C-alpha cells in the first residue's frame, strides 16, 4: 500500500492565526506531521509526504520532532520520501491516485491523535475494489484508502458526502470507518483541547505526543470554565 501524507508547508493552519503566530503555526504543523509519520511507520508502511514546497524532515523539524520508528527499508526516519506538488490538494492527490499501481491511503497531516492501531484498522478496511473513508467532523474526509482504479477525490465542501456519491457512481463499495482518533483533525483553536487531553494516550512510548508537548511549550494548558473544558495560554 502506498501511504501519502499531504502537507501544506508554506502557510499551514491559517485558521489558528488568532491564537498562534506564523512561526508558531509552522512549528505546530511540523509536530503534527511528525506524530502522523510516526504512527504510520509503526504500522509497517513507508509514508510519502506530499508537500506544497521542498521540505527537509531533518531540517524542517527539530530532532525531537522526527518520527521515532525507522520505516522498513530506510536507513533513518528522516529519509522518508517527500514529493513536491504545489497544486491544490485535490489535484495533487488525484495525481497520486492516477499514477498508483497499488492501493493508496491518504492520511492528513493534522491528525494529531492518530495511533498505529487506528491507522491499521483503516488500512485493513474496505473491499478489494472499494474505498474506505475515515470522515472528519463537519463532513470532511480525514483519511481514506482507495482500491478502485477510477476513484478520485474532491476535497471541497462536505467532501465525505461527495466521496460517497462518487463511489456509488463508479460502483465502488464504500466503507465508513468510525474512528474518534482519525476523525479529529486540528484546524480550529477549540481542537487544541483534544490534543492536550489525549496526547499522552497517543504517544507510543507512554510519554506525551510531540504535538501536545509543543502546545505546552507555547504556553497552552487546559482550563475548565462553567463546566466546559477549553484551552488557555500563559504568555508570561
Curated annotation (Swiss-Prot):
Stored Gene3D superfamilies: 6.10.140.50, Spore Coat Polysaccharide Biosynthesis Protein SpsA, Chain A
Pathway: Cofactor biosynthesis; coenzyme F420 biosynthesis
Pfam families cross-referenced by the UniProt entry: CofC
Keyword S-adenosyl-L-methionine attributed: no
InterPro entries hit by this protein: CofC, Nucleotide-diphossugar_trans
Source superkingdom: Archaea
Keyword Nucleotide-binding: yes
The entry's keywords: GTP-binding, Nucleotide-binding, Nucleotidyltransferase, Transferase
Molecular-function GO term, any one: GTP binding
Subunit structure: Homodimer.
Family affiliation: Belongs to the CofC family.
Protein name as annotated: 2-phospho-L-lactate guanylyltransferase
Organism name: Natrialba magadii (strain ATCC 43099 / DSM 3394 / CCM 3739 / CIP 104546 / IAM 13178 / JCM 8861 / NBRC 102185 / NCIMB 2190 / MS3)
Gene: cofC
Amino acid at each position: 500500500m502506498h501511504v501519502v501524507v499531504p502537507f501544506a508547508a508554506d502557510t499551514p493552519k491559517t485558521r489558528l492565526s488568532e491564537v498562534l503566530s506564523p512561526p508558531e503555526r509552522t512549528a505546530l504543523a511540523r509536530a503534527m506531521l511528525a506524530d502522523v509519520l510516526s504512527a504510520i511507520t509503526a504500522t509497517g508502511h513507508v509514508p510519502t509526504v506530499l508537500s506544497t514546497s521542498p521540505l527537509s524532515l531533518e531540517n524542517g523539524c527539530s530532532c525531537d520532532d522526527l518520527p521515532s520508528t525507522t520505516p522498513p527499508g530506510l536507513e533513518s526516519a528522516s529519509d522518508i520520501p517527500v514529493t513536491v506538488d504545489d497544486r491544490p490538494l485535490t489535484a495533487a492527490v488525484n495525481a497520486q491516485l492516477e499514477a498508483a499501481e497499488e492501493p493508496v491511503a491518504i492520511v492528513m497531516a493534522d491528525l494529531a491523535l492518530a495511533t498505529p492501531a487506528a491507522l491499521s484498522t483503516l488500512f485493513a478496511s474496505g473491499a478489494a475494489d472499494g474505498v474506505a473513508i475515515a470522515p472528519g467532523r463537519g463532513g470532511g474526509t480525514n483519511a481514506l484508502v482507495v482500491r478502485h482504479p477510477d476513484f478520485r477525490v474532491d476535497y471541497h465542501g462536505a467532501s465525505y458526502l461527495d466521496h460517497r456519491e462518487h463511489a456509488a457512481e463508479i460502483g465502488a463499495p464504500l466503507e465508513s470507518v468510525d474512528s474518534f482518533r482519525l476523525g479529529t483533525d486540528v484546524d480550529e483553536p477549540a481542537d487544541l483541547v483534544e490534543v492536550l487531553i489525549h496526547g499522552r494516550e497517543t504517544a507510543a512510548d507512554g510519554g506525551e505526543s510531540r504535538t501536545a508537548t509543543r502546545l505546552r511549550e507555547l504556553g497552552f494548558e487546559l482550563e475548565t470554565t462553567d463546566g466546559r473544558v477549553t484551552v488557555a495560554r500563559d504568555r508570561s
